Amino acid sequence: MSAMTVVVLGAGAAAEADSGAGAAAATGTGVIAPEADVAHHGRLSLWSGELSVRVASENHGPSAVADATVRLDFSVPLVRGQELPANCLWGGDRTVLCRTGQLRAVGRGGETAIALRTVGDPDEAVVQIDTVWNGGASDRNPDNNRHRVLVPATGDAYAY
């Protein structure tokens, strides 16, 4: 068994930790955070002012995540007062936040489907998808949970 030194940023101290199950990162409290590689994938389409969003989250491990939150930011104004799925809420005029639910280590969560009306009939929209919260886990590969997708108003589905 080997030991590794974990430097706690901002604390000016180091904590000794057993490397045990593999790599982990330090939180601000000096506690070793679990490592989980959360990723989001799905499809987007836009046609006649209706924006269709499908997002599925998965965890490449090695640790499970009790819950995570994915943020969807839209470049176009959305009609106010639209109803969202039970696992989602409005985070602003152009932002929707959705819970993923539990993500097992090396497992996939459910898919969330959202139909949104835009103000007017835009020619295109840009949608940014990213993880806002992952239960405090360290994610050494955040690139697979951050996407910026151009969605032309063709009715075609654009995968991310």
Model-flagged regions — what are they?
Residues 53-55, 119-148:
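Serine/threonine-enriched low-complexity regions used as flexible
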Residues 39-66:
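Short beta-strand elements of extracellular/lumenal beta-sandwich folds
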Residues 18-48, 79, 158-160:
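Low-complexity, acidic Ser/Thr/Pro/Gly-rich terminal tails and inter-domain linkers that flank the onset
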Residues 58-64, 75-77, 119-121:
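Short solvent-exposed strand-capping/beta-turn motif centered on an Asx-Ser/Thr pair
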Residues 67-97, 102, 146, 159:
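A surface/secretory-pathway sequence property marking extracellular, secreted
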